[in-house]
Amino acid sequence: MSSYAWSAVQDAPVEVLFPGIRARPLWRGPGGAQAIVLEIDPGSCWQGIDVHDPGPEEVFVVAGTFNDGIRDYPAGSFIHAPAGSSHVPQSVTGCTLFVFYPEG
């Protein structure tokens, strides 16, 4: 078990990406893989287009309702965004996401 890595969201540093949108990095692995918690306040929207490059993005909606610029995803939803795809992350009600980038 000594090879396990763990972190608590409340102890993770807060990186403000845009007004009302914060990232809390939980883990970074070899090759750039990373896991983060993304917090989007009610009425907040990503500035510009979020392009998934070099690899895919895996999203699990932990709480609230996430919108990718096209549709809503309620809590409990899983989203796989393939490499090269894009969206505009936002939320009317606010949401918390677990985001995993297997390739960075």
What are these regions (language model features)?
Residues 22-54, 67, 71-72, 82-86:
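Conserved short histidine dyad/triad with adjacent acidic residue
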Residues 3, 17, 45, 72, ...:
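Intrinsically disordered, low-complexity N-terminal regions enriched in serine/proline/glycine
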Residues 1-36:
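A short, N-terminal "cap"/entry segment at the start of jelly-roll beta-barrel domains
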Residues 19-21, 83-104:
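Ligand-binding loop in jelly-roll beta-barrel domains
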Residues 63-64:
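Glycine-centered positions in the ABC transporter ATPase nucleotide-binding domain
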Residues 59:
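Structured binding elements
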